[in-house]
Amino acid sequence: MERIIEIEKMELEEAEEVSLRPSGWDDYIGQEKIKRNLGVFIEAAKRRGEGLDHILFFGPPGLGKTTLAHIISHEMGANIKVTTAPMIEKAGDLAAILTNLSEGDILFIDEIHRLSASIEEILYPAMEDFRLDIIIGSGPAAQTVKIDLPRFTLIGATTRAGMISKPLRERFGMNFWMQFYNIEELSQIITLASIKLKKRCLLESAKEIARRSRGTPRVALRLLRRVRDFAEVANEEEIKIEQARYALHELGVNDHGFDDLDLRYLRILVQSKGRPVGLGTIAAAMSEDEGTIEDVVEPYLLAHGYLERTARGRVATRQTYELFSLPFEPNATLF
């Protein structure tokens, strides 16, 4: 069952996201330090008549890595080719993509941490020397064919920084860590998107949605679309605070942006009576895979102080006990 606050992209969301995607720096809200630095690097590259160095974006899903790649291509006046690492299974897949690029093009690879080691080996000379080394044949008769490539910019995006190999990471000239958004930034995103959706969201309503959006624009826009549906059925011309609160309650998203999955996770930590809980134990208790827990549930809870990771496992913080109105003591239990 899909969560309304799922940070991964849901099916059929691509077209909706594209329609609400900012096209330039003036429309892009948040990530101010990254925007400033990229603005300098883009302007410098344009003045020199060169392409950009390769760029790597780290961070949880839904923070705008793909959007930034499109804005960079727009600002550089370059074409962009978008793909994901799981789509590049064989050397021929990568060769087909690289040989179809033109001078100055941008290649965006999402989930780049999922590239196999053999594909990475082919990518290294392409990134460094703009050359493709293809081995034809096998055994003593094998030959290496070198194909010159146009100068291009590779933009990689990953949610798993630790899974990027050191040799690949070192070939990116720019590395940026995407931060969660604050309520003010999300409120602006929601307000602008509501105008595009032709159902204006009042400021207090936008803030109410923003507070429950887990610091993530993708979640904020999804909640906005669903709240808009409630307002539409109620024959409301605008999204008012009462309608927003009612809709969010019906959607099962509480004041902290938590749903049942988050609360189940936190209850497990609280019930451990202060003892660290291993990731495998949590995943088994929740009937979820470890990757979902680590990539989807934990980042927001960690960033906002609801848990700590130790060498022995996960531990609930004082803030988590307060969430359940429990005293912060090692032997506390939910039941």
Swiss-Prot record:
Recorded GO CC terms: cytoplasm; Holliday junction resolvase complex
Lineage: superkingdom: Bacteria
Family listed: Belongs to the RuvB family.
Annotated region described as Large ATPase domain (RuvB-L), given as residue ranges: 1-181
EC numbers for this chain: 3.6.4.-
Record keyword tRNA processing present: no
Quaternary context: Homohexamer. Forms an RuvA(8)-RuvB(12)-Holliday junction (HJ) complex. HJ DNA is sandwiched between 2 RuvA tetramers; dsDNA enters through RuvA and exits via RuvB. An RuvB hexamer assembles on each DNA strand where it exits the tetramer. Each RuvB hexamer is contacted by two RuvA subunits (via domain III) on 2 adjacent RuvB subunits; this complex drives branch migration. In the full resolvosome a probable DNA-RuvA(4)-RuvB(12)-RuvC(2) complex forms which resolves the HJ.
Localization annotation: Cytoplasm
GO biological-process terms attached to the record: DNA recombination; DNA repair
GO molecular function, one term: ATP hydrolysis activity
SMART domains cross-referenced by the UniProt entry: AAA
NCBIfam families the UniProt entry points to: PRK00080.1, ruvB
Gene from which this protein is expressed: ruvB
Species of origin: Wolinella succinogenes (strain ATCC 29543 / DSM 1740 / CCUG 13145 / JCM 31913 / LMG 7466 / NCTC 11488 / FDC 602W)
Protein's UniProt name: Holliday junction branch migration complex subunit RuvB
Record's catalysed reaction(s): ATP + H2O = ADP + phosphate + H(+)
Keywords: ATP-binding, Cytoplasm, DNA damage, DNA recombination, DNA repair, DNA-binding, Hydrolase, Nucleotide-binding
Region (Head domain (RuvB-H)): 255-335
Record-annotated disulphide pairs: none
Positions contributing to Mg(2+) binding: T66
Residue ranges, annotated region (Small ATPAse domain (RuvB-S)): 182-252
HAMAP family: DNA_HJ_migration_RuvB
Protein residues bound to DNA: R309, R314
Comment on protein domains: Has 3 domains, the large (RuvB-L) and small ATPase (RuvB-S) domains and the C-terminal head (RuvB-H) domain. The head domain binds DNA, while the ATPase domains jointly bind ATP, ADP or are empty depending on the state of the subunit in the translocation cycle. During a single DNA translocation step the structure of each domain remains the same, but their relative positions change.
Sites where the protein binds ATP: L20, R21, G62, K65, T66, T67, E128, D129, F130, R171, Y181, R218
